């Protein structure tokens, strides 16, 4: 992440939005004052000390690589007389037919050894020695042999943590360690006073409870670690284009081998070390490897390309010379540990809550222990005197201390920040199945609060399956149909005009025509390039003949800033010609001539220019993207390094490209509006095209504003403040305009903004936004690295699904906090009050440990994994600054706590009289009944917590098997504890009337919940709602 922050700062002047590590370190120290298990609380976030070491390693390696390159350049001057290391060919290499040692080949590229490369015959010689062809690549049948000799393209990874390491981490809990000591003391004293086996029951019960807590915790954490590992592997899946078996195909970087011919384009991350074959204007950013911020120009004179670097501009083909651990990038990556995730905002907030509650619990625990001890001493002093002590007295004090420590175990809600991780991990897994790869934990959480989505048009709102629908040429507009267009154009334009059109299409394109296994031709490239090239092929044009007839001298690839692509070609007659294709308004401004029907270049009059603009607007009003194609004859002595000219062009044609709106987008936009989320379309297209698509999607409303990027950029700060909230469409925009829009929405109005992007130049906006969403199909690797979420199917409806799950995460954690705080309050108060009044705690250490497991691990599993429902998208997003614990939650917490305290207090102080329980074991029966009723109150309150405002808490419960399984397991184990484990848990078996009473008292919590939800409270809104969002209704919702 540090490399990306530096890249954005140096190239786009965009500061990092994440907190510094020093701030994170101070925060952890602050919340670490009351921590049961610091290692577990901060498990899923980075080890800051290790991360610092990793950064030092990266800087050291970068410095070594940089110095090595300088030294190597100097050493070449003096290397003639030096004795060179000889690399021998092994029998396996010779048998396979290769003629170069793997280590020698790897060093040629990594050391930029031009002399060694020349000695081997240059790039051509290397390709012969590794049995590869620039045109046909390698044969797939050779993959195993090449991997055995030259290696696989994988880096050595540190082994995953075993299950027993998670068990060890769970045992680091300081309060569990203290309880273990208490249990051992209890066993020792018990054996001395009561003998075997009765004397060890109390201590053994605590030990078994600790074992159960540790094992459940370790299993939960281990499963989460496997899930994160799986998601991490998904993040590393990158696909690239190679030429194999004579055809271009897409493969995983892990399947790459030495000899492969790789196609590189803007935004790609170089997957392996290689040598440049040919290309156009290739600029490589090596800052991730060498630390140098200036891009490196790669050509046939300097053909070395290193793994881990990024293509900043241009395109090229390279031959792979080293993979995996034979690359410098592989060696660097293998030394680094897993980075971990920075704490999410919700984790930070809940860490603070857990610490505050922990301090309160510590005070209650100390007071409870002191009260119990003082009462014991008073009673002892009044009976036998303080001078006479027995071993049973020591056992009593040990049990008091164990109870106090257990109160801390229950009071410190260690499960709060961990529940966030569990809920996020569950959501990330589900989103992965729904075509959304969450790269950063915080993104899933933050997306639930998004109030604005700034989305691209092409491929996100539309299908990205483009076809040329209309064409204007020689002042004639034609609708395109595959069967008749060739004949229709021949009837209105001359063959020379048609030939010029086809030359412009075939030469000025980044798409390629490739042959599949069955011999059929397929066009590869961006959707726009494919559409135009397929149109040219539909005109019966001979792509291969045109490709062979002309030589490309210079290519300026399309990017979102220039909005055009230019190519300089050398014609067979010795002359040169520029072809330029791009945004209609930009290309038209560069033209002062046009091609007539006879193929002649004629001056472009103002009337003709106006008619052409009307044609462009007409195409755009039909929701067609428009592109112009033009050419310019140039002198033969032109400077190859000069940029393409910006004037003097002759207009050839205008293409109207159709890109239909994706099915379901209109409904998704409607869902956003009902959820209080504003959708703003930001596109580089013509404003009329953008408005037509926006209206079709339901984005542009009657009071919405559609504006062009240049006009938006020219606005003053005050004008922008008045305008920005009403902007729904921004056309002809640059990446900088998108970044400005995001910055102002966040800065001026405190909006939570999500942004989609696919190009390298979208990196600043993706990084600036609260949630960056990169396209998985059309997106470059640079865009993906800048993003928080990768939308694998490039579909807008998938983005809405991310928002839906984000809201589910936030609401689920609120449910869990409501449930846990209720348990905390009741457990603390009932034990403290009982200690003060009666002189004993009704809930023992073993019982409290079981309650803690219900509350922490099982409660988190049940409530933090609730799937989203449609109601979540009918309420406004949570605004920045709103309290996490709302008034609705406090109403439910206090109401349920008062009810439970009343019931348990009645049983404690009047249970024997009210229930007519008599006999020697009446006290044990009452305490067991209190414990059983307390647990069933939590079981039914867990059901209550499924809905914080709605009365119907059973909606969708059948479909949530995790919740049902947790409730069933809790009830089943409670029966086992009461009926069969009484010796260890200090309980006695209950009759059916007492069981019915316990379940009945617990179930009344459901009725209490209905009554509480009928009590109106304030909405709890703490911040302004600039978009006019409607606050949630008070009181109960519809059932």
From Swiss-Prot:
Presence of keyword Metal-binding: yes
EC class (word): translocase
UniProt entry keywords in alphabetical sequence: ATP-binding, Calcium, Calcium transport, Calmodulin-binding, Ion transport, Magnesium, Membrane, Metal-binding, Nucleotide-binding, Phosphoprotein, Translocase, Transmembrane, Transmembrane helix, Transport
Transmembrane segments: 176-196, 199-219, 251-271, 353-373, 407-427, 825-845, 848-868, 892-912, 961-981, 995-1015
Membrane topology (Cytoplasmic): 1-175, 220-250, 374-406, 846-847, 913-960, 1016-1039
Single GO MF descriptor: ATP binding
EC number: 7.2.2.10
Main location: membrane
Regulation: Activated by calmodulin.
Role summary: This magnesium-dependent enzyme catalyzes the hydrolysis of ATP coupled with the translocation of calcium from the cytosol out of the cell, into the endoplasmic reticulum, or into organelles.
This protein's name: Probable calcium-transporting ATPase 9, plasma membrane-type
